[in-house]
């Protein structure tokens, strides 16, 4: 670990303790509260020590407003990312896909890049495109390029909204080659800490099936529907002083809506945990 400390400018034991405290204590407490296996926590600590964050992207490393709740899904995700895999989170609305993405970027201590896919997304939006600066043609780096450069976590939101020919440029980035070839520019090798996490919903307008070649480059995790403990965990983060009976009643309301939406009795538009939190704040 000496080289890591040296790069951070840490020269003695006292400074090393401060380094670990500032970068790790809060994350470790969250993981222990979730009862994550100590072996995984130890490997995460080593990951933090191994890869420092460049100064110009440190503002992208931040604790999310809502943290994910769910030991099994968290352990699966952490283990896969530690092995160097990319994740594809599939599930219905309000299952915590984006919350999990943000939580994983935070607990790994990596800069987060959010990439929202849509029907008009193309390779230039992802990798970058030529631009004219000071009478010179230069590359305007896209979010995928920046993830590769700085060891970021790329959140590929609603990846099944984009056309297959647009996301095909990611094949070499997502598989064992871990590189980006840009015509007219140098080949970029991915930083060893770079990971990508895709999210997708089925059945929404504009969505499509992902081709097998792309899906095979991810570890796919099917997100379960939220239960009472999960909803209460989210509500307690927003309302730590709220009455237990009131929070439990709101959680029950959300779960009732979830059941009705699942059976097609009501529209899934009403199934919105963010909306529930906003409604509680307004009361």
Placement of each model-derived feature along the sequence:
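Short, small-residue-biased leader/transition segments that mark boundaries at the very start
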Residues: 1-5
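Conserved AAA+ ATPase small/helical "lid" subdomain
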Residues: 240-283
């Amino acid at each position: 670990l000496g080289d890591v400390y040296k790069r951070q400018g840490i020269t003695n034991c006292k400074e090393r303790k401060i380094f670990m405290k500032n970068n790790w204590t809060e994350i470790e407490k969250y993981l222990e509260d979730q009862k994550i296996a100590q072996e995984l926590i130890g490997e995460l600590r080593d990951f933090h020590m191994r890869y420092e964050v460049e100064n110009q992207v440190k503002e992208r490393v931040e604790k999310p407003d809502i943290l994910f709740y769910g030991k099994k899904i968290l352990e699966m995700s952490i283990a896969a990312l530690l092995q160097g895999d990319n994740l594809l989170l599939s599930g219905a609305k309000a299952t915590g896909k984006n919350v999990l993405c943000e939580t994983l970027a935070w607990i790994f201590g990596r800069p987060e890049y959010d990439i929202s896919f849509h029907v008009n997304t193309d390779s230039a939006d992802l990798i970058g495109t030529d631009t004219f600066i000071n009478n010179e043609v230069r590359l305007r780096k896209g979010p995928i390029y920046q993830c590769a450069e700085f060891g970021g976590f790329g959140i590929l939101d609603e990846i099944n909204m984009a056309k297959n020919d647009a996301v095909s440029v990611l094949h070499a980035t997502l598989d064992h080659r871990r590189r980006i070839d840009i015509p007219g520019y140098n080949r970029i090798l991915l930083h060893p800490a770079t990971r990508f996490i895709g999210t997708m919903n089925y059945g929404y307008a504009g969505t499509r099936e992902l081709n097998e070649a792309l899906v095979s480059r991810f570890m796919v995790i099917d997100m379960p529907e939220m239960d009472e403990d999960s909803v209460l965990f989210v509500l307690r983060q927003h309302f730590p002083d709220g009455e237990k009976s009131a929070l439990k009643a709101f959680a029950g309301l959300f779960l009732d809506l979830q059941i009705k939406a699942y059976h097609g009795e009501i529209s899934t538009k009403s199934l919105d945990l963010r909306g529930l939190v906003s409604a509680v704040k307004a009361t």
